[in-house]
């Protein structure tokens, strides 16, 4: 009793509120001092005391007790103001979505936190005995967070996936929620019955799987005699002391520990609190402890490796089922924590960074060499300092020095004036915070339909070389040029192949139009690869892509012009078939291009023509048929224009396709009705029967014509043809009837001897034999077509006063689209074109242009008198490799670029102004004779312009050239910008009726070079017009009075009128992307964001576009110039966010780690590093034992990191689990190796999973290396790969496990608990444990001192030390010369 009194005198007197944690500590100390019985008595007294006091207090709660905080109104208003500014920045493209999300979360989080801190003082001042206040701080039910929701604001919520919803709930529960807020609350609350039930069952299942893995682990021996341990060091400062002591208490030392010469702890001594404190104060060397990892056996564990039992504080007893305890200790917090969710109700919690503020007003100075610019996580510009930075602030009378720690962000510039208390730097939150970060992908979706552009180079992700996933190397904008994609109904989708003609009204459908990629894409690519740029001229294919074409259909001109996705060069070009169709209404149809006819001008996208290629074709409406049929040329000789059928079958540069050109002027069309039916359909008519018009053929099909029915059954379908015509049963003497398939001209022979009748029209005779003896002749009507010379294409190109077409010849060719005797199928009421008239382009082989193999053509649109005219320009090109230009250029305008004047990229659109034939000859000989060629530095291009004659007149002043030449030489005022861009000039000359705007594509963009004084005497200079024309020959030429419909791109034009002054023209270049709110004129209105496509003297036209900011490392989906739809994924950001403090995010993470499901993307080179390292170990350690040691090192490293990962999740929840429980589980999932195929060992079959120790023993016995590699099994797989098949079968897949066990003849030794429970035996633990403890051999321990701090290196040292005996047998002398330290530390290098 006296002893007890003495101990009582030593006890501490607590005079403070005791919460749950303090209570836990108190109970554990009571148990240590007094034991269990006495403690339970004390706790009873505490319980009684608590209930008495609560009854006496009798707190009640009413709605009036909820007092709201007065300062809430203006705080919320302030936060809303900030969010509004942020939204604007995002709209302008200054911050991207992730930065916006982060910042808005932080704004609202700070507001909410401030309100929470206000809450307490507010209650204290107004009403200290408020029941809400008392309850929330009693620690009983409810906490500050809940009270904050009642009287402050609910704040931000997370959705079921744990992502933040960036719409905060501004009301509290006292004021009541709006509808939106209520719905968001329903997301966040997550205390729905279903939700909790599902989570509880998840946690329960996790526990079951965990127990399944480790149920057989029992303490069987006192000491397994291992010499290994894991070293733990207090020194490196990374591990907080609390965690350090937690790791050590209750463990057993694996090594003696020396403090200088003095030994302060011996091997196999268990560690208590006193010893830990001694270690911490002495800062001893790394302490080597025994853990379940180091125990020698995998099927049981020894007392010393396990350590103290957590229940009573002594070494664990023999026969204790530590495996099941471990499984349940890890699973149990899961079940508890799922029920915890509704405390916070899903309210988001996060951390804010610390700030450094300026001590006084003054100018700030720092060394700029020590910082480098970066973006903060909110997208603001800042400086990052890598080492300590001293910042001085000079105020009027005093210098302040502020030290900024490394890795901080400096938010001010050098020499900037700061005010007192202004934030000048932000310190990154330290590593000590427990809630750790996770990587999250965020997809950004497009808000509108449009065309995608980006303003920087992109990389291809290595695994998607051909895909459309690109990595951004630097911060840049992605632009979506607005417009609606071409819509087409499904009917047309089936009919229109790529390149077919379409009427304008067919674009009115609702479906998305997807053009069919041609099958021959790959062949074309192979052909390109095979021929490459070799010397064979005839083999080289300049480009393959779709063709431009203009189709004049009534009111509209449709220009099909696909957008190419160009990678760096021609060979890797991949085609995306996209259309852009500008529709221009033409008012003067009668003297415009051919009125209302279907002339199609075909221009390849790159505009390159070969000789004899088809320039335009015309589909004559006279040669159109609605019905199916067969084309016959009769006996007339035909020949194919190109004999090789497969020369160029893909859609690229169209030379003559293998069509058939007639030598004569007529061909015949034999109509027939064809139905192609699926093989399963039931037909209501018989073969060779005769039907009338509108006869039922199948259930939903009626015949359109009457006649003879022929049914052919093919593999999977039935072809049913109906031939109209007369049937004759001829006599034997008839000669004609013996032939079949003849065309008979009018006025010849007798059809039947009885009725001698002259044939009035052409007929087609076909012999039909229904049976062997009978036959009859079918006489079918024939439609005859005469082929005229075709239309005169001179109407398309009117007579030319400039007579420039000396060099280029056009000839007209008719060809028939179908071969002789080929059947023609019509599909659902479309007309079939039989004959096509072509315009073939050719040019002379004169000496100067003898190298010209190809011409380049493009459309020129010229507005004359308010009308839009199309002109076709054909340039003869010399250089064979001139069009391999990259699409991305430095100036960001997205046009063709070449840097400087390099000759391989000859710009195709340099054009020559010329006004008479003499001048033309002169200009062709001396290209520098005109203003354009003077500006164009490449002298090798010749080009011709085909101008309409309507507005041309002859002009013969020589003075004109010289004046310009001289003035350009001497006038220094011309601003020449060395950036690329298209250029349009307006050249008014007095004799001209009206002004021309010709589009050129020069290397130099000259803004206002015509305002020269000398010119003003001769010419009257009007205003400029600039055009945007990209290298595909697309021209945007808007009429400023109204919107032009670009279908598929309804361009949202935006017109800006302002006084166009000189400095403005320098700011704006064509094709430039402009962010919203950038002011271009001094007092002009702010712009909307978009791409500049027209610049005039007093206005510019901008095509609306939406910018999206993307930071480095983001992946861009889709190709440059691709059409995107609303809701398509544009960019994926990968960013880190701190996990919210809710276990619902934690439990799945634990499960992911234990089931070994990888979520992080591991960089490629990491693997290679580790592989190389393993190889070098194998080399050092000699072959036979290399596998063993490599495997053990890998296992050691992965075990430690797995334990840390799982502990992190639980610690972040404030749950304490002892490491050894996790270690027992991790040991089970890492103790298997997979036998690999390399070594043909006779013991194990390849692919078999065996225990590491078993492989090691077997290798020793066989004295040969068994090849295996380490695998991490998930807990489910580990449960299905145990020693006992009964235990496996009772877990999952019973039938499969039992069948396999039977086939293999497995034996179950009934060592674990579960097998015995299933069979009803005594379980081998506790009293059922037959304690045959072998006296463990004491090894002579050689203490090893190491200088390394890393856990992993310590473990590695032990492995190497453990296998010292192995080295001696298999290593040469040289190895012993290497000091031990060098091969312990070889992973440092």
Swiss-Prot record:
Parts of the chain that traverse the membrane: none
Localization: Plastid, Chloroplast
Catalytic function, reaction form: RNA(n) + a ribonucleoside 5'-triphosphate = RNA(n+1) + diphosphate
Record has Nucleus as a keyword: no
Broad class of the protein's primary localization: plastid
Cofactor note: Binds 1 Zn(2+) ion per subunit.
General function of this protein: DNA-dependent RNA polymerase catalyzes the transcription of DNA into RNA using the four ribonucleoside triphosphates as substrates.
The protein, known as: DNA-directed RNA polymerase subunit beta''
Lineage: Eukaryota, Viridiplantae, Streptophyta, Embryophyta, Tracheophyta
Gene (UniProt): rpoC2
